[in-house]
Amino acid sequence: MSDALDNGRRIRVLNVIDDFNREALWVDAQYSYPSEFVIRALQNLEVERGLPVKIRVDNGPEFISHKLRNYCEEKGINLEHIKPGTPTQNAYVERFNRHFREDVLDAYLFGSLQQVNIICDKWKQDYNDNHPHRSLGYRSPKAFKELYRKEIIYSESVKAKMNDSLQSPALTEST
């Protein structure tokens, strides 16, 4: 997505959202976003979270480049492009972008890229911690992720107990 600073200089914002829990993973503004910057963002996210299985993107020039395609092939990431003119194929990202535009880009007049990124970081934190999603049972991305982790831990604990009980010798009664 794009906007402009108060001096008219154009900026681009790259948003990366986790499809599972709608968490904003990357919200960053630059004067331009060539594919090298997208790759650098993915490399930073790889260090923090590991590699994604799939990335769904629109058909912007930064996403249709050979460099990004080659990077994804090397890393074993499925790079999926939505059909041109069908933003509904990426509806939750479009909704995210609408909230971001309303809450950040339309709400402030920025004088520098640094100012944009300071607000981006604050907004991303608030969004992940406090923004409820109907698809997540009206939980924030953070609350949903915590609930999911607890369920996984509980499920693994139950499985471990079941395995232990199946492996313990059977009790027999002698007469």
Identify the residue ranges that each predicted region occupies:
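Acidic/histidine-rich, metal-coordinating catalytic segments
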Residues: 42, 48-65, 138-141
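Basic nucleic-acid-binding interfaces
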Residues: 29, 78-82, 122
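Two-metal-ion RNase H-like nuclease active-site motif
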Residues: 1-4, 15
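Active-site beta-loop-alpha junctions of metal-dependent nucleic acid enzymes
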Residues: 5, 9-12, 27-49
